[in-house]
Amino acid sequence: MINKLKQKFKRYEIDGYIIPKNDEFFSEYANPNRLKIVSNFSGSAGMALILKDKNYLFVDGRYTLQAKLESGKKFKIHEITKVKPKQILSKFKNKLKIGFDPKLFTNQSLKKQFLPHCNLIAINDNLIDQLSITKKLNGQKFYQLNSKDVGETTRSKISRLINYMSKKKIDNIFISAPENVSWLLNLRGYDNPNSPIPNCRLILSKSRELYLFSSKYKILNIRNKIPLKVNYYEENDFYFVINKLKGNNFSIDEISCSIYFEKLISSKFYINTKVDPCYYFKSIKNVIELNNMEKAHIEDGVALTKFLYWIKNSDVKKLDELKVEKKLENFRKRNKNYLYPSFNTIAGSGPNGAIIHYRANKKSNRKI
């Protein structure tokens, strides 16, 4: 795969290519997991820099050991807090041309790691996708939570956002973070294996028109449940929608708006780069949310207590990492409200215990 990738450098006139762990929605549950395809690294955070004659993998302190085990044969491993990509690039006499997918980076994240020691070349057609068609499509539809279970209606949340726009004199706002769309519309889905956050984005205008971008078949269950005029579009229609919107300015989120979308919006509107106000709105929990958090903590605590009792009274010589992981989830499944684990269980025995975010598999599985 790496050699095939490097063969494309000449066509695009680049000296290297960047592959982050995240996907277009900045999710750690990347679909496709391009970083794993290239490097075999399976951790939740990381980034590869592929140059013509050398390959680098940057991870945080949790994953240095895991990265060496999974990717050390073909990659030079660096802890990103100690060595950044721009430090590697600064050693070259002439600035290298480094290609990247603008859908996978914000301006903030790219500049922090790479500038000023290279020339960045945006390539819209992802080079890994050209070599490997791996995206798994999820056919399950979105669903909306009952406002009684979350403590606030969608109408109320949208009104709060409209009031914010009015005070800040914002004509249009782009909510690019799926978790904020999820909060704003009380929306959930099945796009990610360990999270109910649906992959979607939205635009809200000061005239209260809402444009929701997602696969159209996924929104069939919610079309008539959002108390506002909603226009549903595929993501490929984004530029078409931008051109029909009115107003002079657009607010985008500096944390989650990719370079790709920022460029499309800036072709017609003056951009205000701010932090999405939904981050602030949702950080203040209402009484129902607080009660539900407490209830969830107690219910999960019951499952964990039963698990600890079980393991204390078991013959540990007969147990291994996978059996322990399965048993813990079985206790959690007894709760009628249980959906799935929020992250993979970390059950490491012996040397596996030194791998901070270890996940057992048939090959690595050890006795307890």
Give the ranges of each region predicted by the language model.
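Ligand-binding face of N-terminal immunoglobulin V-set domains in extracellular IgSF glycoproteins
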Residues: 98
